Amino acid sequence: MSKQSVLFLGSKPIGYHCLNYLIQHQDAFNIEIIGLLSNDNTTFDSTLSLKKLAKEHNIILIDALNEMPESDFIISVQYHEILKKQDIEKAKILAINLHMAPLPEYRGCNQFSFAILDGKKEFGTTIHKMDARIDHGDIIAEKRFPIPTNCWVNELYDLTYSASLSLFQENIANILSNQFTLQTQKDFENERGTSIHFRNEIHDIKRIDLSWDKEKIERHIRATYMPGFEPPYAMIGNEKIYFSTTWNEKK
């Protein structure tokens, strides 16, 4: 039986480990990974390069979406570009995305921050079928977990990363063998709610107004203080005054 072809689109540690899992199980899953698209974002871990991993296993590097060949499957994990209808249709069987947030509650970007700002008690991660709208396609599999009290954004990221890798490893074999059911997100919108956020919104929620009450200030700091990124700040005159974790420890 001929192997099914897979195009992998991804970045960040979760993308690296999902790609590596597929590489290690190519024979068991009866697949061939025929190409990788990645911006090789190593912000979270400089040792995890998807492009280097692909080269080590003779996987072709593809520079742009319009250069993708047809494949049986497209698997997207934290890919940095939005796929258009014509891109998704390059998958003859199925195009899927691993979205590190619960759906339909949090589509788009900065989902960890907004969940903390919204005071959510539960978070999650989702594998869904891709369509032309952002994080909108039918749900294939999901995993949910409680958000700890006074959770910081990096803690929620770590919890979601672990849940996402487990979700992928537990479900990808069935997905590749067409053993799954689809659930439309619309069926959950009344119960769960829905929102979409964009990458540039993080700049607005990092700006702290010192006239806010203490709880709101603390919540914004917990939601936006991520090691390796610009910290939350307040403007005093024309100067940015940055907050740090020591503020939380001394309060």
Specify the residue positions occupied by each region the protein language model found:
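One-carbon transfer enzymes
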Residues: 1-251
